[in-house]
Structure formats: C-alpha cells, structure tokens
C-alpha cells in the first residue's frame, strides 16, 4: 500500500508512457524533478510490471491498462495520472484499496472538438460532402 512519504525530489521517480507532451517534462524539470523516464509507447504487462515497481508516479494515456495485478506490484506508487478524458484503463477499486489516487484530464480534448465542429460546419456550408460524392462517382 502506498504510504505517506516525504522524499527528496531527486529520489522521486516518474514513469511517463505513451508519448506525453514535452511540456509535461519541462514542468517537472522546472519544479526540480529530474528522475523522469519517458517511453513513447504503451508497454505489455510484463514490461510494465518491471518498470512500474520502482516508480512513484505514472503518467499514461488510454492504451496502458493498470490492472489489480500490476498495481499490487507497484509498491512505491503514490499516484496515477491519466492524461486523457477517462480512467477506465485503471482498476479504480484496486487503486482505492491500495491508497493510490488517480486523476485525469477530462477537458483535454475540448479545443480539438471545438475545432472539428467548426471545420465540419464550414464543410457543410460549402457543400463539400455532395461535391466529394460527385467526384467519386466520376462526375
């Protein structure tokens, strides 16, 4: 179970998976956290167990699945950051039982969704779907 710890910043280990934005690493570095491992992809369960066992914090997106088995082997884990909308990739009951808080970024896609809506409005106003269909039919 995660304990209340007071660790020096240079001893706190971050495991960041799935190509998180470079700003995350800049913010951590500026705050004095330099023990940050950045892996651009999700890991298979065996690799994840090996990497997470010494991590205090893990940052993930939607491809990494933190099961009860994985969380129980993460003895030093203090918190889980889901840098995505949901937390369904984390066994929340196991995290709660182990005293590991889980947080997410529920509005991380807001700007992208707004941009897409505006682009689709413009596309519909200009009749692009109809014109596209005509071109594909050879007309």
Give the residues covered by each predicted segment:
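An N-terminal-biased, well-structured beta-alpha scaffold segment characteristic
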Residues: 1-103
């Amino acid at each position: 179970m995660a304990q209340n710890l007071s660790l020096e910043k240079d001893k706190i280990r971050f495991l960041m998976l799935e190509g998180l934005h470079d700003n995350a690493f800049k913010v951590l570095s500026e705050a004095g956290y330099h023990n940050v491992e950045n892996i651009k992809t999700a890991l298979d369960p065996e690799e994840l167990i090996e990497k997470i066992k010494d991590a205090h914090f893990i940052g993930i997106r939607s491809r990494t699945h933190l099961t009860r088995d994985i969380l129980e082997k993460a003895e030093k884990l203090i918190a889980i950051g889901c840098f995505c909308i949901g937390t369904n990739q984390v066994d929340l009951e196991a995290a709660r039982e182990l005293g590991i808080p889980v947080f997410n970024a529920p509005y991380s896609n807001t700007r992208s969704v707004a941009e897409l809506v505006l682009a689709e409005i413009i596309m519909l106003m200009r009749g692009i779907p109809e014109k596209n269909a005509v071109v594909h039919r050879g007309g």
